[in-house]
């Protein structure tokens, strides 16, 4: 009898262990094993990264990257036609007369510049960083943090590329005198604590940025900003992630066109991934693994095309829906006219997407500069290397 009981006990122990293993496998973090640090040979998994990442000579030909943008921001060349400017000083003590060698000194120059960094840096901006036209901020090769101070402001500018930075813990900073360009000092009000703020600007490409914990938005684009691509970025730990269009009265935002491609919207995000007004927004092959209220929201007739994305809903039954329409400004009859399309998206853990408007629009917009979506089953691979990269000179990135 004792032997029989031992055998029964062992049997049930094995059953429990097997069940625990299966449960653990089912509840592996949402990015699963793909989020572990990769140590193998270079793998460029999406169309943008394939353009430059696995070239071991990327550091000798940095400006090749300017040919790699896709989507609505594909014409952004940044400082491709200019010289290299090296940031050697991480200070930001004088915002009216910034020192040569600082990041602030580089971004206000009249000439096109490809701005790189001479070492690992943690930069605390005393005031918002005003980036003028024809500039690239290229953090490849070093770990560059913009942290614990103001964020980046792109205002009335064009041809901007921002790549491979870690932007986090951004806070509002007070108003006052600030050099806005090489030959102009302006009196500015306080800022809101955005990570990157785009105001009345065009031809912008933001790529491979790791962002978390700003005060207002991580990335906001307003005041008729257009022709923007945000790609290969990793977002975590924030409430209101992206705002495209500041209010429901600024109708000039109808010309806004923004591409989101190959981004990972990760842990502890709440809403606005993005929140859109008026314009045309193409969301392609992004990985939405967390949202607490909603993922994609909008109003004022925004057109939203979601293609080949992966949406993994939270377990909470009340937040399975991906989309949110601002019902205070529109009746059901009105928002049902807004064209929101889900095409080839992967809906997991009960996620739902409520479509509306012209579901045949994709057949009518071949002339637009849209990234061709890959199957949503590949999203985990396409976004595997999202966020700032750890690039080493002389090796594939």
UniProtKB/Swiss-Prot annotation:
Pathway: Glycan metabolism; pectin degradation; 2-dehydro-3-deoxy-D-gluconate from pectin: step 2/5. Coiled coil: none annotated. Glycans are attached at residues 134, 227. The keyword Signal applies. Residues 1-25 form the signal peptide. Ca(2+) binds at residues 191, 216, 220. Binds 1 Ca(2+) ion. Required for its activity. GO terms for biological process: pectin catabolic process. It comes from the Eukaryota. SUPFAM superfamilies: Pectin lyase-like (SSF51126). It holds the Pfam family Pectate_lyase_4. The keyword Signal applies. Keywords: Calcium, Glycoprotein, Lyase, Metal-binding, Signal. Belongs to the polysaccharide lyase 1 family. This is Pectate lyase. It comes from Nicotiana tabacum.
